Amino acid sequence: MGKFAVVLGSQWGDEGKGKVVDLLTENAAAVVRFQGGHNAGHTLVIDGKKTVLHLIPSGILREGVECMIGNGVVLSPEALMKEMAQLEAEGVPVRDRLRLSESCQLILPYHVSLDLAREQARGKAAIGTTGRGIGPAYEDKVSRRGLRLGDLFHRERFAAKLGEVLDYHNFVLQHYFKSEAVDFQQVLDQSLALAETLQPLVMDVPERLRELRAQGANVMFEGAQGTLLDIDHGTYPFVTSSNTTAGGACTGSGVGPLDLDYVLGITKAYTTRVGAGPFPTELFDAMGEHLARRGHEFGSTTGRARRCGWFDAVALRRAVAINSISGLCVTKLDVLDGLETLQLCVGYRCGDAEFSVPPAGADAFATCEPIYEEMPGWQESTLGVTRREDLPVNALRYLERIQEIIGVPVDMISTGPDRDQTIVLRHPFE
């Protein structure tokens, strides 16, 4: 009997999900994206060749793996076509294996204009969005005025709906943000021009998942961003606009919760964050710079430098609980090579009180100071190690301590960017 497994980030994103999904899809029949949009940046390195995917599931580089974009994703037709063209130029037969839910909300040019105008208006209080229209598209979805992929295949219906929603957004752009209006005819023509290409890719994703379940196939659900950026459970308002947690795999694809057999939480051996928001273990000294330099911590979507800090076990415990995480994959262990000592955050101090769980909301979170437990580092290299017994003793102790604090096993360890630089202790599909 096959398994349905979820792979998601258990920190603030950028944990290395793309590589792990790519590795695990060797045993998968299909990979499903269920939330987010082209604000994701999943980096894969295969035989030294680097590929960055923003929208298309990471399984696209595995021959024969079906790739689906579920209804929970906000879809930019323009970004999708660009990514398809890049992959096809490299010989990847994207159209043979990519399938789209017609219930995907569309990201259109006015969403991008709104996103940029809002961030500019916030000034120093900016959230740090990617400026790609993700948030405004999700707003339209919740307010029930959004256009969906299925609308694109009905010219008159699409034009009528577009006219209504664009009147609304242009009023806001012009009269509130003092920005330029978005041209109706230009958006209409650009969108309809893509309909013929996209329509053959449409599939009833929930029904296909039911078929795969009945066939006993392995299916991977690929999360984007990370648990601490979840719209409900993250450090609100410094969050993304979707549910990045395991529950989002169900609502964003149409699979039932009892069909999920395993949840793999991806976590770096340290912690990073992009953009604004509280980050208790953030390092502002030479050590923070060292982690950023060794870990090549620059966003694959925005190019922005990531903030770096020590491992935060408090935040990870919350992520484990919210997602019912079955096992952890610890990535970038090799970045810690050569350090004399390491710090593990095992609690928070907020004023006179100490906490073993994160407080609710960004304001309270921002007042927390980390309570550290010091551990010895290791001088040996872990880069490319593929067997647990070949890891340095102190690296093993570090992983065992994380496992002990968090309460779930470390099932995988990543020791480098290539798919083969991985230690698999328990496979999600076995």
UniProtKB/Swiss-Prot annotation:
PROSITE patterns recorded: ADENYLOSUCCIN_SYN_1, ADENYLOSUCCIN_SYN_2
InterPro entries for the chain: Adenylosuccin_syn_GTP-bd (IPR018220), Adenylosuccin_syn_Lys_AS (IPR033128), Adenylosuccinate_synth_dom1 (IPR042109), Adenylosuccinate_synth_dom2 (IPR042110), Adenylosuccinate_synth_dom3 (IPR042111), Adenylosuccinate_synthetase (IPR001114), P-loop_NTPase (IPR027417)
Keyword Lyase among UniProt keywords: no
Segments traversing the membrane: none
Subcellular localization(s) per the UniProt record: Cytoplasm
Keyword list, A-Z: Cytoplasm, GTP-binding, Ligase, Magnesium, Metal-binding, Nucleotide-binding, Purine biosynthesis
Principal subcellular localisation of the protein: cytoplasm
Record-listed IMP binding positions: 14-17, 39-42, 130, 144, 225, 240, 304
MF GO annotations: adenylosuccinate synthase activity; GTP binding; magnesium ion binding
The protein's Enzyme Commission number: 6.3.4.4
Domain of life: Bacteria
Entry note: cofactor: Binds 1 Mg(2+) ion per subunit.
Biological-process GO terms, alphabetical: 'de novo' AMP biosynthetic process; IMP metabolic process
UniProt binding sites for Mg(2+): 14, 41
Pathway where it operates: Purine metabolism; AMP biosynthesis via de novo pathway; AMP from IMP: step 1/2
Residue numbers binding GTP: 13-19, 41-43, 306, 332-334, 414-416
Catalytic site positions: 14, 42
GO cellular component, one term: cytoplasm
Catalytic function, reaction form: IMP + L-aspartate + GTP = N(6)-(1,2-dicarboxyethyl)-AMP + GDP + phosphate + 2 H(+)
Broad enzyme group: ligase
Annotated PANTHER family: ADENYLOSUCCINATE SYNTHETASE
Quaternary state and interactors: Homodimer.
Family affiliation: Belongs to the adenylosuccinate synthetase family.
Protein name: Adenylosuccinate synthetase
Gene expressing this chain: purA
